[in-house]
Amino acid sequence: MIIDTTTTKVQAINSFSRLEFLKEVYETIWMLFPILILVLGITIGVLVIVWLEREISASIQQRIGPEYAGPLGILQALADGTKLLFKENLLPSRGDTYLFSIGPSIAVISILLGYLIIPFGSRLVLADLSIGVFLWIAVSSIAPIGLLMSGYGSNNKYSFLGGLRAAAQSISYEIPLTLCVLSISLLSNSSSTVDIVEAQSKYGFWGWNLWRQPIGFIVFIISSLAECERLPFDLPEAEEELVAGYQTEYSGIKFGLFYVASYLNLLISSLFVTVLYLGGWNLSIPYIFISEFFEINKIDGVFGTTIGIFITLAKTFLFLFIPITTRWTLPRLRMDQLLNLGWKFLLPISLGNLLLTTSSQLFSL
């Protein structure tokens, strides 16, 4: 009888241990699932941006874009990525192998961290932090360190010059960008991305920060283009001057990482324009009766979440037409012109905009 009781207790303990183990596995999977969904969404978003840029560029230049890889050439970016994956990874003979290898990873990871605070709905955000927007600025400022490490580790004068240019450009335009974000935080009384979007939803379309901060919006666009190193601000990798800048010695998947980092940065900058200035996930139709008739802003559940994601992405990809068309419209600036624009024009303008915003907030109390 004693043996049977002991056996029953042992079986109960084993069953409890298995249940605890299954619970831990379930919690781990549930924690990783949103991250996997976000990574998948980011990957698809980058592929769509590459395809859009090629199609729009072809249209501007009056030529036929990619058309063989998949319908309408939509799989061309995937084909290029697969090709880079199987290319040989070459290392510079006299370079610093450690810095050369870790540079691209730092650039990509620092940009990816910013996606954690992008809200696609009031409850659809991985990390709703009170310092949300400033966390993005902090982690994005790490990327130029990776570029500088890549340029220095390549032991190539063109690569090193490209890394130095990337660092100088980032420092010059990070400050106006931060001042614009600070102005938005003052208007919304919060630095949380969710709170900033909800503050814009009170008055619909006319409540967007685009109308309350037009100067900050323009400065933010110019600064974000410079941070993404898009034309006319692509001096760190100017082909005519530096071959390919800090990317000169790279090949294979490491070169592909720089390529991906460029489009990741472009996508997250456009997402932040949507969140900070264009009302985020809110539909914000100018005519109030339409939103009330369809009850679009009041829908909860899966359908409401889907609508929020769709609206955020629609605003983001519509805004992407600006940096894509700018690439084939404006000529590249000289280095002195780029630095003068950042320090002598954008910095005073963004500082004045911040002072005006602070004054208006004080007088409205």
Swiss-Prot record:
Major location category of this protein: plastid
Gene Ontology CC terms: chloroplast thylakoid membrane
PROSITE patterns membership: COMPLEX1_ND1_1, COMPLEX1_ND1_2
E.C. no: 7.1.1.-
TM segment ranges: 32-52, 98-118, 129-149, 257-279, 302-322, 338-358
Keyword field: Chloroplast, Membrane, NAD, NADP, Plastid, Plastoquinone, Quinone, Thylakoid, Translocase, Transmembrane, Transmembrane helix
Catalytic activity annotation: a plastoquinone + NADH + (n+1) H(+)(in) = a plastoquinol + NAD(+) + n H(+)(out); a plastoquinone + NADPH + (n+1) H(+)(in) = a plastoquinol + NADP(+) + n H(+)(out)
Biological process, per Gene Ontology: aerobic respiration; photosynthesis, light reaction
Domain of life: Eukaryota
UniProt enzyme class: translocase
Topological relation to the membrane, as annotated: Multi-pass membrane protein
InterPro entries xrefs: NADH_UbQ_OxRdtase_su1/FPO (IPR001694), NADH_UbQ_OxRdtase_su1_CS (IPR018086)
UniProt subcellular location: Plastid, Chloroplast thylakoid membrane
GO MF annotation list: NADH dehydrogenase activity; oxidoreductase activity, acting on NAD(P)H, quinone or similar compound as acceptor; quinone binding
Coiled coil: none
Pfam families the record matches: NADHdh (PF00146)
Oligomer and partners: NDH is composed of at least 16 different subunits, 5 of which are encoded in the nucleus.
Similarity-based family: Belongs to the complex I subunit 1 family.
Name of the protein: NAD(P)H-quinone oxidoreductase subunit 1, chloroplastic
Native source organism of the sequence: Spinacia oleracea
Organism classification: Eukaryota, Viridiplantae, Streptophyta, Embryophyta, Tracheophyta
Gene name linked to the record: ndhA
